[in-house]
Amino acid sequence: MALSRSSSPVETAVAALGNFLFRHRNKLFPVFYVLLFVPSPRLTGNLMTIMVSGFMISAMGQVVRIAAIGLKYIIRGGRKRRVYAEALVTDGIFAHLRNPLYLGNILILVGLGVMANSLLFNLVVSPLFIFMYAAIIRAEEDFLGKKFGEVYHRYITDVNRWLPRLSGLRETFESMEFRWKRVLIREYTTTYIWLSGTVLVTMRNLAQSPDNSFYRDHWQWGGYALGGLLTIYLVIRTLKIRKVITA
């Protein structure tokens, strides 16, 4: 949907809310993470189906983020906790989808919510998370429209906000260099967080299952997995800080 040149009062209010949420997003994200473990009625008793389905959703989000970062990393992390962008990025995965990093974040959290088998999280928390990103995106669109003008308005006319355009995706990957090192040093924290969440949610689900014999006999494997993920995280972080690996 194209962004209107003159914003309505509702759009202006949403953009203002988006700017507020953007400034405080680093405080809000841990809250959403903790809410995964709040006691709630279950979605289903079929634990295996819910775990596999949720993991696939989160993994899809990770793939979207990897594609966005590996092909073209966008510097849009904010300046002085305000929405900011150095340049308008329209190539790479951004030629097919305007907000791949945000879509990836949403899929990752929604997938974790499904894995948590939590009715409360899926009915309340996930929609709130999506709304939060919708407001942040509206604030970014307002900023980018003012900064880049007609170029940006043409871009949003051609490229969807949420749904990726699949046509030409193969040609995009073939025409651009994919930088795995950049993915590694930019994405290791996000990957560590959601994979650790997956392990914790799995352990909680197994412990609460009617037949928790598998958890009682193999609970230590969850600890091994968390320890392994933390080790990998610290190794990559150390290599990044010492500039052994650079983008």
Residue ranges and their predicted role:
Residues 1-94, 106-247:
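Membrane-anchoring alpha-helices and their flanking helix-loop junctions
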Residues 99:
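Short, conserved phosphate/pyrophosphate- and ester-handling motifs at nucleotide-, phospho-/glycolipid
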